[in-house]
Amino acid sequence: MENRWQVMIVWQVDRMRIRTWNSLVKHHMYVSRRAKGWFYRHHYESRHPKVSSEVHIPLEDDSKLVIITYWGLHTGERDWHLGHGVSIEWRQKRYRTQVDPDLADQLIHLRYFDCFSESAIRNAILGHRVSPRCNYQAGHNKVGSLQYLALTALITPKKIKPPLPSVRKLVEDRWNNPQKTKGHRGSHTMNGH
């Protein structure tokens, strides 16, 4: 019998991002209790040698989101791709599919966190009381309408310390982004001074 390959998307991330993600998940599971029902599986509980951790996040209707972090993978093209990665799966019974970080954040947002959403505009106009803030800003991936922006400017969201774990933040590529210069003078080395 020949080998059967299964291809899956694994986002390359650095080791420190995975450590930060795991500590945020554990904090909100055990200390702040904002992540009720989440399940954390350690590397020694997994049968796969490359799995470093798993986070199971239950959603609606028997479905769940599973974020698996890996170690010991082949290194990437860049020096900082040291063989660490993340896969994001949506599971319902025996069906599994992979999702991107934005969709994962939206699914978490819809299920777990209070939101000052688009429906708040209509309720505020009608004079109903609305939830004044969104506790999970990572779940919003688009710019809202002008009314929504006006309401959010009027009522500023409260910052939660430590922040809630965001899948998009976990897999973002901060290495390939150009570095921002500070101040109005710009970078001295680039200006030739």
UniProtKB/Swiss-Prot annotation:
Query: What Pfam families has UniProt attached to this entry?
Result: Vif (PF00559)
Q: Where is this site: Cleavage in virion (by viral protease)?
A: 151-152
Q: For the region SOCS box-like, give the residue spans.
A: 152-181
Modified positions (Phosphoserine) in chain numbering = 145, 166
Region annotated Disordered sits at 173-193
Q: Which residues bind Zn(2+)?
A: 109, 115, 134, 140
Q: How is it modified after translation?
A: Processed in virion by the viral protease. Highly phosphorylated on serine and threonine residues.
- Identify the residue span(s) of motif BC-box-like motif: 145-154
Regarding the membrane, this protein is recorded as: Peripheral membrane protein
Q: What cellular-component terms does GO give this entry?
A: host cell cytoplasm; host cell plasma membrane; membrane; virion component
Function according to Swiss-Prot or TrEMBL = Counteracts the innate antiviral activity of host APOBEC3F and APOBEC3G by promoting their ubiquitination and degradation. Acts as a substrate recognition component of an E3 ubiquitin-protein ligase complex: mechanistically, Vif hijacks a host cullin-5-RING E3 ubiquitin-protein ligase complex (ECS complex) and the transcription coactivator CBFB/CBF-beta to form an active E3 ubiquitin-protein ligase complex that targets APOBEC3G and APOBEC3F for polyubiquitination, leading to their degradation by the proteasome.
What does the miscellaneous comment read?
Vif-defective viruses show catastrophic failure in reverse transcription due to APOBEC-induced mutations that initiate a DNA base repair pathway and compromise the structural integrity of the ssDNA. In the absence of Vif, the virion is morphologically abnormal.
What is the annotated quaternary arrangement, including any partners? Homomultimer; in vitro and presumably in vivo. Interacts with viral RNA and Pr55Gag precursor; these interactions mediate Vif incorporation into the virion. Interacts with the viral reverse transcriptase. Forms cullin-5-RING E3 ubiquitin-protein ligase complex (ECS complex) by interacting with host CUL5, RBX2, elongin BC complex (ELOB and ELOC) and CBFB/CBF-beta. Within the ECS complex, Vif interacts directly with host CUL5, ELOC and APOBEC (APOBEC3F and APOBEC3G) substrates.
Regarding protein family, the annotation reads: Belongs to the primate lentivirus group Vif protein family.
Q: What is this protein called?
A: Virion infectivity factor
Gene from which this protein is expressed: vif
